[in-house]
Amino acid sequence: MPRNLFPLLYLVVLLAASHARAADPLDDYLSLDLQELLSLEVTSVARKKQRISESAAAIFVITRDDIRRSGVTSIPEALRLAPGIQVARIDANKWAISSRGFASQFANKLLVLIDGRSVYTSTYAGVYWEVQDVLLEDIDRIEVIRGPGSTIWGANAVNGVINIITRPATESVGTLVSVGAGNEEQLVALRQGFALDQGGAGRVYAKFNRRESSYSPDLNGEAGDDWDKTQMGFRVDLALSEQDSLTLQGDAYQANENQVLREFILDPADPANLPPDPQHPFLIPFLPDAFESEGYNLLMRWVRDAGDRQNNLQVYFDHSDRQEQVLRQRVDTFDIDFTQNIKLGRRNELVWGLGYRRIGDDFDNTFRTIFYQDPQIQELYNLFVQDEFAWREDLKLTAGIKWEHNDYTGTETQPSLRLLWAQDARHAWWLAASRAVRTPSRLETNSSIAAYQLPPDPADPVYYPSPGVVRLEGNPETKSETLNAFELGYRWHLDEGISLDLTLFHNRYSDLVTFEATGSLSFQVPNPLNPGEWFYPPNSLTYDNLRDATSQGAELSLDWQAHENWRLRANYSWLDLSADVDDNSTDAFGDTVLKGSSARYQWSLRSQHSITPELSMDLWIQHVDALSRSGFSRPRSIPAHTRFNLRMAWQKDDLELSLVAFNLLKDRHSEFGAENIFVYTDVERSVLATLRWDF
């Protein structure tokens, strides 16, 4: 994406602002009672519109007003608002986000969508969170499903689905200018919305944000992970007829990111790599890495609503280009998806759909990371059907199944069965049993990674005279990881303005990926993943599926409208995760990291208080239990920590001025270990002042 396009779009937005129309006032969800909030419609559970109270799934909605009043400036930070979602900042531009365990930078059991467009990367099996962005003011809601959603959304929707849904362009006619500055972050955003003929509308936006470097205990100072990103985009909504509507939208971004690599392994065959350390001659203790990432996407959605039948056709293309020292990659994704919703009488409703996805990737191989079969094309085909049958007015049964074919493991089957009982106007119960799979990534099937370097053998310099590198080799026979999940949910609502949402779950995982040795050397060396321990290093490692796991837990959210201008919300989640490795496995460290990276419990409390029509105050406190071994390549024990944020805002007509203080309790704290080979970092206290003009 040429850089000169970004300032050009800024100019276009500024010129368009001179023709601004009046904008709708900010939504005030405090004016809604809890019954109305429970009646908010969601679409991610069943690929159709339904109220939260009618959903047989553990779903939570983060509203636009929740995001605004929290003061957060990114999608990852907004996800801290949801119960059962573990969000940990690894450094200034990386996060570990997961649902119901298995936290890591690339949490491979969580599917993330933006307006139905998957941002899950098949390279690592996860999400590059720092480049997943939209204009936060244009988000309508974030639908967070905890638990499997694979019958509807396919493979990798194992432990949860996050769908970030933006507002129609008809709801953003007018001009928005937002500017923020603080000791850790600076941002500016511009958006112009305009009306079109026959009830249509469009908008364009541009935004820039920069985050300063965090603190690194490894470096005893700045972590060298500062970054900035420029993004622009558009959306057009057209009413083609009384039944047909068309949406066109797209985004483009360019990010300049920095990171410091710890113990980076150089190519010993390269004469330019001089040996600074006789014991580790090709190992650089700290290597700064400045790189660019850029990408764009285009999406088209056509909807025909004929009353008892609705058709939905969505097509998108996504391009990303990422040039790190660790891995240089370019990925293109084309996806087409068709869904039809049919009402079969008064009690029966059928949803079915089919889809095709083509992923093309290309890598610049380095000594550290090699991809075989480069470039490669992957193709996926899927078909699903789901039927909802109302036995009685208060009892609904939903049964569905999805077939999906991929190039790695062939055809995968993912069924689900859900039952909802609306006991009365105040009480509702639901049950669910589901099967979901996580398909292997490109990395796990046909790659080679320089995992760590070994020192020479002091006892036998003839047999092993020089340092060696242990490589992790991909395995084309890697199987899909499988989950069988069982859930029980309960919702309770009182007229006095109190609601409760409780979910219990039991998950059984099989064929989880392990790291297996292919032979071992004759001498012991320090274990790079467990300091203080020694082990016989392998000649090389490879992937296999020799681990099973079990988890159970509870997730609770409480909502109390204490007064017409004061609302309290509390969340609590508890998780117990255990794993068993096959007797034939040589994986010596996976279980420790698997269990140690997920918080056993966490809780939060939020207070939203509109003191006067112009002045509001929001308090948010969150506590996360200790992590015994978080991060894979460089695990780290993380003490329990408590975050406390305070936001004060003054609003007059179209103008809002806010001041947010983040992490008030401590100067800095740790949240996660180091993924890959990055240095440890801490999250620091920060303040941010924002001025927003929406007219």
Give residue spans per PLM region.
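Extracytoplasmic beta-strand/coil segments of soluble accessory domains associated
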Residues: 43-60, 76-118, 140
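Short acidic/polar hinge/loop motifs at secondary-structure boundaries
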Residues: 118-146
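Conserved C-terminal beta-signal and adjacent last beta-strands/turns
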Residues: 193-195, 239, 431, 593-695
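Face-selective signature of the C-terminal outer-membrane beta-barrel domain
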Residues: 239-255, 287-411, 420-424, 498-504, ...
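Gram-negative outer-membrane beta-barrel transporters
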Residues: 390-394, 505-509, 528-631, 690-694
